[in-house]
Amino acid sequence: MSRRSTSRCFAALASLMLVAVLPGTATAAPGAPPPLPFVSQLDLSCYRTEGYKPPPAELTLKHLNPVLAKLPMETVKLGERQQLCVPVAKNGEIPPPGIVDFVRWVDLSCYRIEGGAVNFPLTLSHLNPVVRKLGIQDAHVTMLSPEQLCVPVAKNGVLPPPEVLSFVRHIDLECYALRVLGIPAVPFPLTLGHLNPVLADRPKVDVKAGNARQLCVPVAKRGDEIPPEVLDTLQWLDLAKYDVTTGPSVVGPVTLKLTHLNPVLARLPSEEAVITEPAQLGLPVAKNGKIPPG
């Protein structure tokens, strides 16, 4: 091969690698983690980040989970950013290899939305092994109106590896207010440690999780072409958000730069967010006994 041909090959390879990591470009998913091992290990610590409103964006959402498949499509307007949710481990239990490689890159920025009440009755069962060991009972709830749309972002320009990016960039969760039926839950203690590299130096936090306030369910935005192997896992991603309380903090706030990863929102500018202490904790659940496969 001539020197000129070799140079052209290297240039083409470099171009392909660049396309693979750019948030606004399409890329084929080489694979995805199996549904139950991934979903059951995804815990998100959610921080308040009020004060920023993105440029106007109107989105049409379609439900992905089989239990909610009959709910109609809806169009929402992206409002003020309210939370940033980042991946954590509970009580020192790190997700297993091959799963943690995906979990640690799930950062979701949550924006206010509005919509009509669906009044959908559900029974929620915990999936995470740490919570199941605590003996937390199933919760009987009614899913009310949508309150937030949580979409994937990167922090401080640190992108997931290409094979992970092609999966996490499609995670969109629509969060509905809940009416919890029966006796309020007894708060349960947990110790949270950060999994994402950007926040790895943050100390662990002791929290008490109280009542479930929201149920976040998987949706797809019109214009987002989700690969079949990615959809097979994401359709099972349901998180119940619980209010948490913490002790007095000795750690100062952290300022982060957020960049959108989903192709539909790639045109939106980067955002600044300041986080301090967690306000809620998203825990994986199954709806009406429908356990994710795998």
Can you say where each PLM-predicted feature lies in the sequence?
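Extracellular/lumenal glycan-associated surfaces
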Residues: 41-56, 104-121, 169-186, 235-252
